[in-house]
Structures are given as structure tokens and as C-alpha cells.
Amino acid sequence: MWKIVPLCNKQLRDINKIDILHNGHFRKCNTYKSGGGYDKFPQIAEKRLGKNVFNQFIVQLYGCVLDCPYCYVTKDGYFGDYVLYSSKDLVDICVKEGLEIFHLMGGSPALYLEDWYEIIELLPNNIIFHSDLLLLEKDYKLEWLNSIKTSNSLYAINIKGVTLDDFYKNTNREFNVGLFLRNFDKVMESGINFYLTFTNPDKRYLNEFKDILIGEYGKSILDDSFVIDLIEYEALKD
């Protein structure tokens, strides 16, 4: 069973009422529009998977390992009272709503990485499974990653800082370098389909950080990567 946190009152400030689903337990949105224009997921999905998709079903899981001050989900949205859903229930709702992308979101959705395959196996091939990895939730197992490598899945690795100070500023957490690198190596070994995003990076050091990644993993590691600049969400205005 999945711990799903319904939309909280702060989140609702930024959500169109027509996008609220299932009594506020879920929402839908246009992928490009939802990011204020920054999200390149539709273009990447078309390039990598050959699918022209925009409309996503958003499932918000309980829990997060970070404390990002800019997070529009807010603590109420990932540490709020949760309700339980089975994988089949979630997939059935997505299919019924006619949505093209199943977005398993957080918080930190990879806290549940070992269970993602349950949803993926139930999804029709015409629906893309999308979720996010921080590489910091816990030690990944290669078998978990192998279980989510499919022709209709696409993942984002979200990098929250390009220096130790930058990471702390963005997350209120110390950067666990060893865990990050161990998980990055396992992701690379697994061959899952992913791209990188850089959230609010210190741009003075961004290219230097990218060079480190290229030196470790090759130039292709940056294919389709992009920067996510911060947006002033209504959810964060008290």
C-alpha cells in the first residue's frame, strides 16, 4: 500500500480547481505549464521515448529527506496525514482520467524505490511512468533499479546544489557525498532512462560541477539536462 498525502491548503493556492482529482487526493496538470515553462519533460519524452505527451497524473507520497525552503509542496504536503492506496487503485484512477504520464512525486518518492515496479508493471504501455531521484534517500540496490528499467519509463535525477554550501542553502541538509556517488554509480550501471536537473544552482560553480560529472561519467551524462530556477509560489506566502 502507498502512503498518499492529499493536497494541503497551501498547495491549493497554486492549483486550478478543475485539476483536483478524487476529493483532493490527487491532481492533474499539463507538464509544461505546471513548471511555469521550465519543465523540458515533454521534449525529452518525445526524443527518448517517441511519445508526445503533456498531461500528467500526480501522486504525492509521504516523506522527504530534505527541507528545501522553496518547495511548493510544503511540509504539510509531504508530512501531512496520509491515506493508503494500492498500486492497482492508483493505476486505475490514472487510466480512468485518460492521463498520459503517471508522476510519482514527493517529497522524496525514491524512499519507496523498491516498490516502484509494482505500479510500472500495471501501467499500460501508452502511459509513461515518471519519478524523481535525489540519490540521497538511502542506499539504492541494483535490483531495485533494474526492476524499473522499462520502455515506458523516464526519470529525473534532481541535483540540489553544486557545492557543499550551495546544497545546504537549497536543502537545509548536509550533502552526503559518499551516498550520492554510490547511488549515481548504481544508476549508471542499471542503464535506466534518466536526465539531470539542477535546482537553483550557484551558477558561478555550475560548469565546474558539470566538468566533474563529465570526467566521471562521460559527456552524455549532461544530455537533456537543464536548470530549474526558483518560482515564487503562492503556497510559500504566509
Residue ranges and their predicted role:
Residues K75-Y85, E97-Y112, N125-K141, I148-F180, ...:
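Core AdoMet radical
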Residues C64-V65, V162, P201:
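Short, solvent-exposed loop/turn segments at secondary-structure junctions
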Residues M1-V65, P69, V73-Y78:
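N-terminal [4Fe-4S]-dependent radical SAM core
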Residues M1-H22, R182-D238:
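Auxiliary Fe-S-binding modules of radical SAM enzymes
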Residues D89-I93, D115-I120, W144, N176-N183, ...:
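A general structural detector for well-ordered alpha-helical segments in enzyme core domains, enriched
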Residues Y72, I120-N125, M188:
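Surface-exposed amphipathic alpha-helices with a cationic face
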Residues C94-V95, W144-N152, L213-G218:
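Acidic (Asp/Glu)-rich catalytic clusters
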Residues R48-K51, D92-E97:
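Short, charge-rich binding segments
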